[in-house]
Amino acid sequence: MRQVTIPLIQSKSMFCVIYRSSKRDQTYLYVEKKDDFSRVPEALMKGFGQPQLAMMLPLDGRKKLVNAELEKVKQALSEQGYYLQLPPPPEDLLKQHLSSVGQNTSPADR
């Protein structure tokens, strides 16, 4: 009897490698391959500083990421080779409080 070999078809899993900025707090750079910043603009790398490895993360099968939109990350990695996650805007607690008590926060209206 003749043996038949059937090749396994493996889909390419999507991974990303996440680096923390050494210059900017809560700023992260996602790339496709570890230590490969070849598709990241030089000016961005200069402002980002020395990348510090934070984690490697499989994107397939995930429903969401903590501080980034999964589909935006996947699209950016595919199209430009990187995704830059910036920190959330600072909370303006005074503005929130004044708004909750019905006061206008515009300096012109004071």
From Swiss-Prot:
Coiled coil: none annotated. Residues 87-110 are annotated as: Disordered. InterPro entries: YcgL-like_sf, YcgL_dom. Residues 14-98 form the YcgL domain. Pfam families: YcgL. Residues 97-110 have a biased composition (Polar residues). It comes from the Bacteria. This is Protein YcgL. It comes from Salmonella typhimurium (strain LT2 / SGSC1412 / ATCC 700720). The gene is ycgL.
